[in-house]
Amino acid sequence: MQRQLTFGGGVSPRNTRLRGQSIIEYVLIIAVIGLVVVFAGPGVAGAIRNQFSQVTNTVDSGTEGDSFISAEEKAYREAMKTVAGKEAKDWTLDEQKAAATDIAKNGTSSVVYAKAKAAMDAGTTWSVKLTNGKTMTYRIIGINHDDLADGSGKAGLTFWVDSFSCSGIRFLNNYTNKGGWEKSNIRQELLSGEVWNALPNDFQLKIASVTKKSLDSGSQGNSSCVDTPDKLFLASVSELFGGDSTEGSQYERFALIGLTMNSQLGKSDYRITYTRSVKANTRDEVWVLRGDAEPRYSAVASQTLHSFECIRFAFCF
């Protein structure tokens, strides 16, 4: 069983009180020193000034030091030291989530940003045992890339699943791409069906809901871009290959390896997987991704995924 870390933070009420009172206290002390100078002479006043400096230094250092931070903040910092002290490949599921949370909070200043970036660049993978007995591997493809669905900021890390075998699923049942990703069969599987249910409960709880954009139809002049809140999602053509960012910008990992519409993902992988992008100016086609040929390939939306095909989906922590 993995160790559950609890994180929190914030400036302690005690420190806030000291800061709030400090201006008034400074004024009163300065007034006292002024009176002492008049009635007792500069020698005594100098001694008082020294004591005053010590007090102000103590008050001013409260937020940056450890004297006035909360127990929760201390625990958070210690926990992040542990995560930062490990190689990213050795991060537990809890530590992956902790790293993502800290990166979302602190950006490039996060103590784990460099290690997460190095792991993304190197293609480092993690794995999780699914409820169906199979193992799923995944890797980082984006850092502070996706917008949280609640509007509170960015998801720290975006991951992409290497493959998830799921035969017998169609993008859409009817012979049209109308409705696009939002109404697709695959999205329902990712929301609450076979795919979602295969993930362990503690894994599900760590996944963040993000906003994804997609066109609702391939029909010329009749399509519009819609936003959907998604925990598991297929990558769009632009997130994979770059270019027009209507459905999102290219993930950093794919840009790093030079993936474009005219490149190959990898000849060793012959599987086919859907993207969430419908093909423009068509009535019934969607873009799919192939490893053994140019990704510029489309399929009829009602085509069924066969046993040699898979779903490659993404998620965020």
Predicted regions and their residues:
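Intrinsic structural disorder/low-complexity segments
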Residues: 5-7, 24, 54
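Collagenous Gly-X-Y triple-helix signature in extracellular proteins
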Residues: 72-317
